[in-house]
Each structure stands twice: as C-alpha cells, then as structure tokens.
C-alpha cells in the first residue's frame, strides 16, 4: 500500500505530465478570444457600411454581402461562446467546452457548436450564388433585391433543416463523459480536483440518420460547389475578355476586380480544409495530443473573421466607409485629393452597350462598384 508521501509524489508527477495540456487549453481559449473578437468587430463594421454606404444600383448584390456578414458575425459570437476542444473518441463526436456557454448548460454549448458548423456550410452556397450572380449580371443584368432575398432565404431554409437535424441528435452528457474516460485515461478527465466540472457535449455516435445527414451536408457538397465556382469564374473572365460586351476599360476592370475579390474569398475556406485534414488524421490515431484537439476549431474561426477584409479591400464604397469611421478616431486621416482622383478616373462614361442586358451590367459595375 502506497504511503501518503508516495501518493503525493505520484499526484505531483501526474499534474506535471498534464502541464502541456493545460497550456494548450489556455492557448486555445485566448486564440478564440482574439480571432472571434476580431471577427465580431470587422463584421459589425461591414454590416454598418452595407446599410450606410451601399449605392442604389448595388443593392441586389448587397443582399449577398449582408448574408455573408450576418452569418459570419453570428458564427464568431457562437464560436466565442462555445470555444470547443475536440476529444477524438472513435465513432462519437465529443467536445469539451471552455467558453462562457459552460456556465449555462451543455445543451447551449452544443447549440453554439451546431450553429458554427451549419453556418460555415451555408457560406459555401452563398459564395456559389455570388459567382453565378456576377456572371448573370454580364449576360442578363442584375436581378432585383427582392429576388435575391428569396434566393438566399431558400438556400438558408435547407441549411436550417440540417442544423435542426444535427442539434436534435445531441448525446447524453454522462455517456459522452464515460466514452471520454475510457478512451483517454491518460488525461484523468474524471478527476475533479484536476479538471473541475468539465462541460461535455456532442454526438454519442455518428451512425444515426440525423448525424449522417448533417455530416454529409457539411462535408460532401464542397467539392462540386468549388467545381461549379471555377466554371462560372472562367465563364465570367472569358466574357469580359471577349468583344461581345461593349464596355469601357474602367467597367471591365471593375468586374475583373470583383471576380478577384470573390476568388480570394473562395480561397479562405482553405482553413476548413486544413482543419478537416487535422481532424481526419487525429480521428484515425495518426496524430494525437492537445495541439490537434485545440487547433481544429480555431483554424475554422479564421474563416468568418477574415472574410470581411475582402469586402473592405475590393469594394470601394465599403472601403471608403471604413476609412471614414477610422478617420473619426484620429488614427487615420483621409486624403481627399487622392480619393477624388480615383473616383474621377472611374466616372468616365462607358461606351453605349448594344442591348439592355449590357446596359444593366455596366450600371451595376461602373456606377456602383467603382474600385
């Protein structure tokens, strides 16, 4: 039988062995605060300038931008509240939640987690619609705002159903804890003196119809979506390069710059792919430890946090709106003469198009999206 001294020594050694895990958990918490906090500020600013600085002829496209911004904002808020740490546990999806949601309930934490996952999947569809929109503007003219609202709402209805499927399949907390204890005994998660009352939630098994549908929706469509995005991107660029449309160089440059913006936005989900790769490797036991457990969702947090930067960089009215806000703080003073010269450059009247669809395309780009 071990003496008190030996017990104390063994416990000290155990706690010492868990120090790296403690450190990585703290790093994960602070990364969540920084990344999501940054994203919340940027998306709030973007929503503000969309309402205040969107020109009349750009309103239909602003529906897509607003959809991006509002879901990115809510995703950052939900992820900050959850701050989930993935516990790779075979066929179960188990998460320890370090965010403020843990002070309310494990159900709220899982709700936030489900919202984050479904919102990121929904953003892929809005990105696809954005590329199709840009092409249709060139060949048919811009659709009206009401039509865009209907299209976006229909696509979100599909995502909302998947969200409910995923959330309703929430597992029993005690069962998930027992799975975690059995598969990860080295962490001693059952020791309250070390970990306190940890908040755990997730799916007991992924082999249920709701979970399988949700996982399929959030992972499988991304490949065909990106093929279609690439198709419409190439068609748009080839249309701009052809002589079929009678446009001024400034108008063509405007369209090309917006396509560049969408292309960069399409590259942002690389964080999702890297996170998915880490998740897969850890799920099959190829890698393990507190780094993949904490880094997976922090990488995904970078998607909604960085997305608004594309709009601010490439869309002139929003960039100007942001600079006006910053100039009021005294950090930055706007150079009126430089901005005026840029605006004057792109205010040159375009050549007359040969049909009404081309006129609408010119109006949508040259008059409202001067960059």
Curated annotation (Swiss-Prot):
Keywords: Membrane, Transmembrane, Transmembrane helix. Residues 354-365 have a biased composition (Polar residues). It is a multi-pass membrane protein. Residues 344-371 are annotated as: Disordered. InterPro entries: 7TM_GPCR_serpentine_rcpt_Srd (IPR019421), GPCR_Rhodpsn_7TM (IPR017452), Nematode_rcpt-like_delta (IPR050920). GO terms for cellular component: membrane. It comes from the Eukaryota. SUPFAM superfamilies: Family A G protein-coupled receptor-like (SSF81321). Its main location: membrane. It is found in: Membrane. The keyword Cytoplasm does not apply. The chain crosses the membrane at residues 31-51, 62-82, 109-129, 148-168, 209-229, 267-287, 295-315. Belongs to the nematode receptor-like protein srd family. This is Serpentine receptor class delta-1. It comes from Caenorhabditis elegans. The lineage of its organism: Eukaryota, Metazoa, Ecdysozoa, Nematoda, Chromadorea.
